[in-house]
Structure formats: structure tokens, C-alpha cells
């Protein structure tokens, strides 16, 4: 059995979330009082682990990643995950974007990330990090017909682990056992719907779901669509809306999501970001660099389709313990 190592949390008060009344008590809730985008929510060792782009810097210029840890999606601790200054191949271009984490068969964790339009991999003994970067990217800029960003991960029912990525075209490839390389000849691609970026996969009851973001991250109409298939090779159904902006509530640019199952249940959670409001409730603007992450339940209908997620202002409180 793998022992999860928990390091000391960072002392940082500015990521506390909005107060909300639950069972006659005021508690913190989501979204957090911190600009965070491109969420990757995972569950390890009975806790939520949320990896994201630390946002709020012009032109997406952040250079380090944090991991946020919670028992209930409401009260969070923050830990350092990876600093691009420790990445040997990073040339200083662009910033630290769109992380995604997978647990290997040996119990270790691989942290995928974007830097300089390349996808890197870093390994850690614990989901808390820190993660030690590999000497070369796992996906080099220009190798595939897409903008090399937005890694995602998927573990199929047979245990095969996959890496997903791409802007403009979606790519998927089965990973080697160490999750640090893949056979480029086995990578497949497609362009679902009006695909822009952030491809994600999940499987339930023999149905595969591909979901992705459409439009530009700076566009108020940034949104999530999905399609269904009986296998990863398709054929995929016609795209349907999954998360659309709620214009009547001024909740815009609802995209770049991921989906996670609560182990031992048929409960599913979707994490996504949208244009942020600052702690005083003022809109932070639609430059695409000031975004907030929210969490919501994801419902699978009896016919296998997904119930459209309605963006809300309130909270989603779901304890694991």
C-alpha cells in the first residue's frame, strides 16, 4: 500500500473562498478568493486534489504551480507543486499552464504541464508534490498538428493510461508504463464539433464521453460540449452542450473543465473555470487572465446522455469523510 506523504501547507490566506450558510453555520465555499483556471480535480487517499493554472497575471505569465487540497470542496490547503525555474528545458517563453495528474500503476504520480508551448512531465511520490521535472518535454512543440497545450489524462477500464492534449486538434495516445513517454505512431487525433482545446475523457457503463472547450478563453462564449461513443475509436455522437455561459447571471466563459468520479459511488463532479469576480464582488474583466474555478455535480441521465450543467453563483459542498 502506498503511503501518501503530506508536507506542510503554505500559509496563504488569500485563497479563502466566499462565505456561505450551510446547516445554520457560515462556512467557506467555492469559488475561491484566488484567480485559478484550467482546473484538474482528482481524488486521492480520500481527499480532493485540485491542480490549476494560478491566474491573474497578464498574458498568462505565471511561472509556478500550486496544488489545493480539501476534504469537502470548501475548506482548502495550499501546497507548492512545481516551479518552472526548476524545469531544465524551459526557455522562459509563455507561462505555467493547465496541469493534469495521473497515478501510475506503481503508486507514484506524474504531473503534466504546459511551458513554452510544450508539454512537460514531472514525477512525485505523493499527490501533494513537489514534483521533479523530467529533462525533456513529453510532447515537443511542432511534433503534432496542433498547438501543444492543455494536457489531460484518462485511465481506461483495462488500466491503460492515456495522455490527451491539443488546441485546434485533439490528440490521444496510450502511455508507456512509466507514463513518461508514448509511441507517437499510436497517437490518434480528431476534431470534435467546433473543438478549440482542453479535451477530456471519462467512461461510465461502457459509454465513452469526450468533452472539450469551444471558442477562445477570452471570449464570453467560451463553453463546453460533449459527445458519446462505444469505444475510444468512435464513432462519436453529435456534440451537445455541457456547460454554457449563463448570460442572465453574468457568468461568462464557462470552460476548460475536467470530470472526476467519487470512488465507490456513481457521483460525478465537474470542475471548470469562468471569468472571475474579485473578493468584493466586482467583475475582474474578460481578458482571459482573471478566472475562477467552480465545482458542480455532473448527472448522467438514464439514456446515457449528460444533464447540462447550469452555472450557479452558490456553492457545492461535498464532504468525502
Regions found by a protein language model. Give the residues of each.
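Carbohydrate-active catalytic/glycan-binding domains of CAZyme proteins
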Residues: 1-321
Amino acid at each position: 500500500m502506498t503511503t501518501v506523504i503530506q508536507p506542510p501547507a503554505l500559509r496563504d490566506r488569500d485563497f479563502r473562498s466566499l462565505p456561505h450558510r450551510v446547516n445554520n453555520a457560515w462556512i467557506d465555499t467555492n469559488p475561491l478568493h484566488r484567480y485559478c483556471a484550467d482546473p484538474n480535480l482528482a481524488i486521492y487517499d480520500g481527499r480532493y486534489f485540485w491542480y490549476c493554472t494560478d491566474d491573474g497575471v497578464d498574458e498568462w505569465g505565471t511561472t509556478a504551480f500550486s496544488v489545493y487540497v480539501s476534504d469537502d470542496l470548501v475548506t482548502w490547503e495550499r501546497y507548492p507543486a512545481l516551479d518552472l525555474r526548476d524545469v531544465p528545458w524551459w526557455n522562459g517563453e509563455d507561462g505555467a499552464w493547465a496541469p493534469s495528474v495521473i497515478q501510475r500503476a506503481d503508486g507514484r504520480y506524474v504531473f503534466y504541464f504546459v511551458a513554452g508551448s510544450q508539454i512537460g512531465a514531472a514525477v512525485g511520490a505523493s499527490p501533494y508534490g513537489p514534483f521533479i521535472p523530467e529533462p525533456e518535454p513529453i510532447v515537443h512543440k511542432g511534433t503534432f498538428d496542433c498547438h501543444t497545450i492543455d494536457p489531460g489524462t484518462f485511465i481506461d477500464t483495462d488500466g491503460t493510461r492515456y495522455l490527451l492534449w491539443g488546441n485546434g486538434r485533439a490528440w490521444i495516445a496510450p502511455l508507456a508504463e512509466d507514463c513518461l513517454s508514448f509511441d507517437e505512431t499510436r497517437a490518434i487525433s480528431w476534431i470534435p464539433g467546433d473543438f478549440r482545446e482542453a479535451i477530456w475523457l471519462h467512461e461510465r457503463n461502457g459509454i465513452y464521453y469526450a468533452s472539450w472547450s469551444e471558442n477562445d478563453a477570452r471570449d464570453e462564449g467560451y463553453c463546453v460540449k460533449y459527445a458519446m461513443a462505444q469505444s475510444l475509436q468512435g464513432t462519436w455522437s453529435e456534440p451537445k452542450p455541457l456547460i454554457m455561459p449563463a448570460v442572465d447571471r453574468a457568468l461568462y466563459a464557462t470552460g476548460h473543465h475536467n470530470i472526476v468520479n467519487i470512488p465507490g459511488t456513481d457521483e460525478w463532479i465537474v470542475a471548470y473555470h469562468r471569468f472571475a469576480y474579485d473578493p468584493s464582488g466586482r467583475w475582474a474583466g474578460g481578458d482571459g487572465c482573471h478566472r475562477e474555478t467552480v465545482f458542480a455535480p455532473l448527472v448522467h441521465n438514464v439514456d446515457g446522455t449528460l444533464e447540462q450543467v447550469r452555472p450557479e453563483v452558490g456553492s457545492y459542498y461535498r464532504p468525502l469523510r
